[in-house]
């Protein structure tokens, strides 16, 4: 582990997610599992590299309901907002019609959680013609540890097959050489 407590293997993945979220067109929801070790890091990386006119929000269990509702209302009127949110706060019960992309930034194998999370981007919007899910997984296994991220990804692929989702698996070789931006 490095000084901030982030696994070295995770650094290029965080940078990839940062770059992906900043490059996507439309409003994007980045879902994470753990506030301190995932969400706060992703939010900081994205927010520190965004354009001046781009809105980036950080939502987790410590954010009150009124602020979450305000973020939802703002996002409905935006074209390029990024919401970095915990699964617990934004995977269910949030209705944002003007949401174009969802990024699964943390592993989960829960069928209900995954389908509910995908449902966030499937809401029909006024000018929305496409909804895209980016399901991020890594293969950072070590000899002494199982790679739960990859195992959970395999479980999600089974769900996508059962639900007849169209998907493409893209392998990207990441380098641990810092930030693109």
Predicted regions and their residues:
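Conserved RecA-like P-loop NTPase helicase motor core
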Residues: 60-163
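Conserved strand-helix element at the start of the C-terminal RecA-like helicase core
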Residues: 10, 14, 18-45, 160
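Conserved helicase motor "Helicase C" RecA-like lobe of SF1/SF2 P-loop NTPases
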Residues: 29-63, 67-70
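Short, high-confidence coil segments that cap the C-terminus of an alpha-helix
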Residues: 25-26, 53-54, 79-80, 99
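Conserved beta-strand scaffold positions in the cores of enzyme catalytic domains, especially
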Residues: 56-58, 133, 167-169
